[in-house]
Amino acid sequence: ALIGIVGRPNVGKSSILNRLMGQKIAIVSSKPQTTRNRITGVLTQGEYQLVFFDTPGMHKPKTSLGKYMVRSVNESVGGVDCCMLVVEAGKEPGDTELNLIEKFKSMEMPAILAINKIDTLKEKEELMKQIARYSLLYDFDAVVPVSAQDGNGMNELLDELRKQAGEGGHFFDDDTLTDQPERVIVAEIIREKILRLCDREI
């Protein structure tokens, strides 16, 4: 199954992808807009193969780079079997989430809602209210609270994603982890370290 990972910047999309894959595929930083390429993670377990498109966060583009990144998100939503919408625990749905949900509706897109950063919530009631709000907005195939930070909920999320895999064949060889060349991954990891050292986006 082709899975598009979508959501606003800095909700933990890349961290979730890295958790699901079990190793670093996508660059992770607190700086906005660090994911520039549609990095693909390929997870093969027996008959299941999940191909992940990790998209840049949705935002209103101010630059030509920003426009390219938003176009990349739109393309990801268009060509996948299922979308995983990642939102931050305790945060109200905003324009980004509502726009993506409208896209899901227009395409009748199977979608899974991953509520990340549940480790930051003090009250469980906040989470229950958030799940109820999103359930009114769209008929998600599953809603899974997770923490990419400590790994909570990742097995449940993977189970739900596997259900989307269906009977389709494998797109990649079983030992493939990403379609990004190794030198690109190395460059991304170096860029992540630079971003952590610098106060502003490179």
Predicted regions and their residues:
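Canonical P-loop GTPase G-domain recognition
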Residues: M109-I112, D119-E182
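Conserved C-terminal guanine-recognition region of P-loop GTPase G domains, centered on the G4
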Residues: T44-Q49, Y68-V143
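P-loop NTP-binding site
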Residues: V184-I202
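Conserved nucleotide-binding/hydrolysis micro-motifs of P-loop NTPases
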Residues: P32-T34, P56-H59, A89-P93, I118-L121, ...
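Conserved G1/Walker A P-loop phosphate-binding module
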Residues: A1-C82, V87
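Active-site phosphate-binding and catalytic loops of NTP-dependent enzymes
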Residues: A26-V28, G169-D173, R196-I202
